[in-house]
Amino acid sequence: MEKYHVLEMIGEGSFGRVYKGRKKYSAQVVALKFIPKLGRSEKELRNLQREIEIMRGLWHPNIVHMLDSFETDKEVVVVTDYAEGELFQILEDDGKLPEDQVQAIAAQLVSALYYLHSHRILHRDMKPQNILLAKGGGIKLCDFGFARAMSTNTMVLTSIKGTPLYMSPELVEERPYDHTADLWSVGCILYELAVGTPPFYTTSIFQLVSLILKDPVRWPSTISSCFKNFLQGLLTKDPRQRLSWPDLLHHPFIAGRVTIITEPAGSDLGTPFTSRLPPELQVLKDEQAHRLAPKGNQSRILRQACKLMAEEAKQKEDQNAGSALEQEDGLCKVTPSTAPVPGLKATPQESSLLAGILASEMKNNWEDWGAGEAPRTSRENHINLECEQGFPEPRPEAMGRQSTDVVDPENEEPDSDDEWQRLLETSEPGPVQLKSPLTLLCNPDFCQRIQSQLRGTGEQILKGVLDGVSHLLPVLRILSSLLSSCNDSVLLYSFCQEAGLPELPLSLLRYSQESSSIQQQPWYGALLRDLVAVVQAYFSCTFNLERSQTGDSLQVFQEAASLFLDLLGKLLAQSDDSEQTFRRDSLMCFAVLCEAVDGNSWAVSKAFYSSLLTTQRAVLDGLLHGLTVPQLPFHTPPGAPQVSQPLREQSEDVPGAISSALAAMCTAPVGLPSCWDAKEQVSWHLANQLTEDSSQLRPSLISGLRHHVLCLHLLKVLYACCYISERLCHILGQEPLALESLLMLVQGKVKVADWEESTEVALYLLSLLVFRLQDLPSGMEKLGSEVATLFTHSHVVSLVNAAACLLGQLGQQGVTFDLQPREWIAAAAHALSAPAEVRLTPPYSCGFYDGLLILLLQLLMQVQGKPGLIRDVVGSEVWTILWHRFSMALRLPEEVSAQEDDLLLSSPSSLEPDWTLISPQGMAALLSLAMAIFTQESQLCLSHLSQHGSVLMLTLKHLLSPSFLHHLSQAPQGPEFLPVVVLSVCKLLCFPFALDVDADLLVGVLADLRASEVVVCLLQVCCHHLSLLQAELPIGLLTRLALTDSASLKQFVNTVATSSRAIISFLSVVLLSDQPLMISDLLSLLTHTARILSPSHLSFIQELLSGSDESYRPLRSLLGHSENTVRVRAYGLLGHLLQHSMALRGALQSQSGLLNLLLLGLGDKDPAVRRSASFAVGNAAYQAGPLGPALAAAVPSMTQLLGDAQDGIRRNAASALGNLGPEGLGKELLKCQVPQRLLEMACGDPQPTVKEAALIALRSLQQESCIHQVLVSLGASEKLALLSLGNQLLPNSSNRPASVRHCRKLIQLLRPTHST
């Protein structure tokens, strides 16, 4: 503080006090912000430090510059530029500003925000109070208490910061948001500067949320079209469509006026918000937004408001019963009797509680939001006047809720309509779940009064007493609101039981339809509509779903559905059209009922839809009849009398409701497969009706395809019926009017209410027709270019994918369409990176992206032989986006790199893939696409594969995991495509081993595969999911991995040793199969195991060779196999096992014919077999024990092999004969002149290794006295001495063969002194 003079206080708030000051020894005027530490939590102090750190690094002419900051014992002091005033003050004094001044301020605000967003900083509290006036008329943005600098890993935020008047829709709904929330706030500020009031203004937080989410902005005529367009862009409710960077800079309203401050960015800053995200990051952002999206539908803002309301109500309840209760909100004072509950006069405290609840909604708690500013009281009348003059008053009921009239509950009639109307307003549901209805339901007196009023009046009506029906109508409306707005299933269902719901409204409906006296009453239509509204709201309650069943609610729901169907069937059977509105409302209620049934179990759906074909057939027949009955003309012929618009709309209501009901009955909802089978029954019935030649249903339905209201629903009906009826597809393929309507719809020549969704259904329907017919219906051959245009130019992702689906089918039928690679690559990138909105199940059980993947595969096949284009695809963003989107569809678990405030994220509990996005068929297409690319650009693709943690490698490994394969085997068409998926993955993983790759790259690939235990996955998939013929490639890959990586080999051995008998049985079947390549791979794997690992790991190999009955049938089959490669590897395996296995030696002795098979290999025509066999016999002879005598038969064959042309065979034969010497076979060896042959080899064989083997054998054999004598008689010492001398004459001792040592030792052993 010694640096500054404190002059005067210029402001005060919840944060502390602001003083005007001057820096000592200078004329610089500053603002000093004193923030007390006392009473602040650690989190608040951290946030303060964050604000200081953010401000410290900001240098911009339109942002307040922090000059200094320091701490005292009790306070934190922040020193900033001194501003001349606040923009808020100008609004207070002048009301609004001329547009040219607003334009200047807009350019400066945009400049400041551009600077912040380019540094990945969100302000999060943009409002007039945070905009200061600088010298010369400029503005400066201040107050960064809620600002957030986002890391490169954080794409969206979820914490609620800011002031409600300027909050964006995504903020008030507590959805994830990004920098576009700041841009919405700028739009609100500029609107307020120009008009005098914010675009959404009310004193009720609940109404404010509703306005922000649902109401359009009201545009006064005083603003220019350019300014209006600018504000419309900023105030777009969908943040994805909101005007943002960089387009914002180029808008004519501010173009050329914005100051851009550029400065070097840090290397770790990441992508600035002012640049468009690369598509792969856009995919990650969408995924992060999806994960961060709130699970419920309650807003944190409104939960806080309701909490405050409840606390206030409780405080009022504790006050004296007779005292008046004042609630000051800056506008009015409300007494406890402002909103009394009808008939609640038991105690003043109870009345006070409910009155407080109702009055609290009118109380303005602005100090709890944002920085704590209250509404500007002095401007209140001005704002109201401005709204009244500029716009029509939209909500008279809102004004009524702010009434200052005092009502005396003692003198008011208990059941007045005004009281019920106030309760109705309190219980009305907003766009998000409010707590007021929940608070009402928690009050037993309110519930009792509602229930008694409903039962009392309802039972009177059922008894024919019609007085007081008018009191029933507001009660019914309150019930509708409560049922629609409360999410507490237990509480709500208990209330319904006590109130007699839904039995009483259904009984009243039935009685009203049957009573002629009621039908004569003026309120008859209103009563029917309100009763249906209650029933509809009841059907939409969550306690009707099996997954959230409360008590016997599911049974009650089914009974109520049956009663309603009875009433609906009778209603549809009537020819009286006097109550068209009631008929329409009943049909819409039926559509809601279908949605509720679809969300239930298979049993509930089956029973409901089956009843429409049996006991409730009247409903279905009535709907079909209603569709064929001639209605008022939809299009007035030329010269005919014009029909008034209200009458026209009324005439369209019932046909629209009928078509909507039919669509609800047969359309399979996305992601709810439990009801598909049940709905197929209805679709079959409709399809049969449509295929009858005499039926009027098909012409009526087809003619409705060109009607702007009916089109979408009737398209869904046709699509559902064609989905299961091939006959209907053939009929429609020959129906000119139907095809013409579909083609005109795709071409945009039919004006319909929901063109995008209708076109999507039409595209899928045409795809289905081509697929079913395997031919092109008339006129479709010219459709290619128009569908291609939709594919490349539409911004609606669902349309792009539907167009891709149809293009794929057209391409298979030979239709040509001109798609340039640059266009289809860009279209694919857009379709894959934008959020997926699946509204309809694509044809033939496909996923949302299947059609796109199949089309991409077709397009890629067309450019085979053009490596440059393939390289462009792999190098483009679409390749990366493709695998990111696929991994999202697979729901790969991954760690969350950042958390938003205290929000803890977890990976999805279920790893089942999202089959609505990509089906097994789509996965097969994607992997085929990857194979085609890998084949032509192997090295480029390997770089993607070898990156540690790459999405491509993670995805491929996941496709082999047991959990995924289990889900795949249970999916529709999963068993059919499972082998295709597995084999495609294996082919892709084989590439690193089939190519000449860098050693480091291969090490990285092996480490990835080892970490995921791919060897284990391959073994399990072969054992549990593939046929023997399909297992060849996985076994080959498994073998390659185990031979290359010792850790993978151990994984294989441990899996076999610890798993069930299934794996041993599978391997045994392989060894006995007629698949020589697979047998050879397995034998190589087993041989490598026997060579590398200790004998304790080899028991399973012994088990495999002996067979289940220990007859050694597998080993016999292998040794006698017709394929040379199999015999070579079988003898090699046997040779390695005989080094350790005593059991195998015993089997050679005890098993009849087994030793003979071993010895037969010594005379095999194939040299490789002879070499392996001689190796095996040599190991069998080593320490043969009891087997030794039996090996005498091998001596002649082995002696003959000493003269083999293959040096390896000669070496093995010499070693084997040397091993037989100590086994007492001297006579047999002498008989075959083995000593002489070995001596000749030792002295004259051209190969040093063979000489060495012969010398070692002679050293072993000379231990037998008879052989020793023969060697002496042959002059072996002299011959060997000459050999030794020749080796000594070599110039370099390092080049002398190892046989020299053996030669000297043997000479020493043959000396007479040694022999004696």
Curated annotation (Swiss-Prot):
What positions does UniProt annotate as the active site of this protein? 125
Q: Name one GO cellular component term.
A: cytoskeleton
- Knocked-out gene: effects: Mice display profound growth retardation with a communicating form of hydrocephalus, nasal inflammation and early mortality.
One term of GO molecular function: protein serine/threonine kinase activity
Q: Which cofactors?
A: Mg(2+)
Gene3D superfamilies listed in its UniProt record = Leucine-rich Repeat Variant (1.25.10.10), Transferase(Phosphotransferase) domain 1 (1.10.510.10)
Instruction: Identify which top EC class this enzyme belongs to.
Output: transferase
Comp. bias (Acidic residues) = 407-418
Which reactions are catalysed by this chain? L-seryl-[protein] + ATP = O-phospho-L-seryl-[protein] + ADP + H(+); L-threonyl-[protein] + ATP = O-phospho-L-threonyl-[protein] + ADP + H(+)
Q: Name one Pfam family in it.
A: Pkinase
Q: Which residues form the Protein kinase domain?
A: 4-254
Q: Could you tell me the keywords of this UniProt record?
A: ATP-binding, Cell projection, Cilium biogenesis/degradation, Cytoplasm, Cytoskeleton, Developmental protein, Kinase, Magnesium, Metal-binding, Nucleotide-binding, Nucleus, Serine/threonine-protein kinase, Transferase
Q: Which CDD domains match?
A: STKc_STK36
Tissue expression per record: Weakly expressed in the heart and thymus, present at moderate to high levels in the lungs, pancreas, and kidneys and at higher levels in the brain and cerebellum. Very highly expressed in the testis.
Which BP terms does GO give this entry? axoneme assembly; brain development; cilium assembly; epithelial cilium movement involved in extracellular fluid movement; positive regulation of smoothened signaling pathway; post-embryonic development; regulation of DNA-binding transcription factor activity; smoothened signaling pathway
EC number, as in UniProt: 2.7.11.1
- InterPro entries, per database record: ARM-like (IPR011989), ARM-type_fold (IPR016024), Kinase-like_dom_sf (IPR011009), Prot_kinase_dom (IPR000719), Protein_kinase_ATP_BS (IPR017441), Ser/Thr_kinase_AS (IPR008271)
Where is this protein found? Cytoplasm; Nucleus; Cytoplasm, Cytoskeleton, Cilium axoneme
Q: List every stretch annotated Disordered.
A: 389-418
The residues that hold ATP are 10-18, 33
Quaternary organization: Interacts with SPAG16 and KIF27.
Give the record's family classification.
Answer: Belongs to the protein kinase superfamily. Ser/Thr protein kinase family.
Q: What does this protein do?
A: Serine/threonine protein kinase which plays an important role in the sonic hedgehog (Shh) pathway by regulating the activity of GLI transcription factors. Controls the activity of the transcriptional regulators GLI1, GLI2 and GLI3 by opposing the effect of SUFU and promoting their nuclear localization. GLI2 requires an additional function of STK36 to become transcriptionally active, but the enzyme does not need to possess an active kinase catalytic site for this to occur. Required for postnatal development, possibly by regulating the homeostasis of cerebral spinal fluid or ciliary function.
Any idea what this protein is called? Serine/threonine-protein kinase 36
